[in-house]
Amino acid sequence: MKTGKELKPGTVIRIDNDPWLVQKAEFTKSGRNSAIMKTKLKNLLTGYKTETVYGADDKLDDVILDRKEATLSFISGDTYTFMDTTDYTMYELNAEDIEAVLPFIEEGMTDVCEAVFFEDRLVSVDLPTTIVRQVDYTEGSARGDTSGKVMKPAKLKNGTELSVADFIEIGDMIEIDTREGGSYKGRAKV
């Protein structure tokens, strides 16, 4: 059991026998009223999203999800097929089931992912915290403005756009932090 004040992003709770992922949690306490936790939730089975408010002392059922290592096997339209690395079982997910990690998934990637199961059903996939990708396009370096951290836009092979350091060129391998939408960490050491 968890209380409302213990909710944080990444926590999974059970509501009406469905697993709900806490995507955002904001604790608020005012002088007159009791403390509350404002949350954004996503149903892991249906993909439905909602905003809910819980009291700090509300009791909630937490859910323990099963996790297995998997790799991306292939992409067919909006269907992504992952393979269990231990028993080679294939699992399929639709694009909307993995929308949070979709910008970092590309055909031929070798990253080992974490397949997340609820009652033997694959509900999502988590990528490693840091992944390495190749820059497919970026503009040339800007001359003169080198007093601070100079960033410029870049595009990855799968079309994802992000800001990278000014010295990054086309073809460079970069490290990306996949948490919170993804951000440039630095040049990859290859």
UniProtKB/Swiss-Prot annotation:
Transmembrane segments: none annotated. The keyword Transmembrane does not apply. Keywords: Cytoplasm, Elongation factor, Protein biosynthesis. It comes from the Bacteria. GO terms for biological process: peptide biosynthetic process. GO terms for cellular component: cytoplasm. Disulfide bonds: none annotated. SMART domains: EFP, Elong-fact-P_C. It is found in: Cytoplasm. Gene3D superfamilies: 2.30.30.30, Nucleic acid-binding proteins. InterPro entries: Elong-fact-P_C, NA-bd_OB-fold, Rib_uL2_dom2, Transl_elong_fac_P/YeiP, Transl_elong_KOW-like, Transl_elong_P/YeiP_cen, Transl_elongation_fac_P, Translation_prot_SH3-like_sf. NCBIfam families: PRK00529.1. Involved in peptide bond synthesis. Stimulates efficient translation and peptide-bond synthesis on native or reconstituted 70S ribosomes in vitro. Probably functions indirectly by altering the affinity of the ribosome for aminoacyl-tRNA, thus increasing their reactivity as acceptors for peptidyl transferase. Belongs to the elongation factor P family. This is Elongation factor P. It comes from Pseudomonas fluorescens (strain ATCC BAA-477 / NRRL B-23932 / Pf-5).
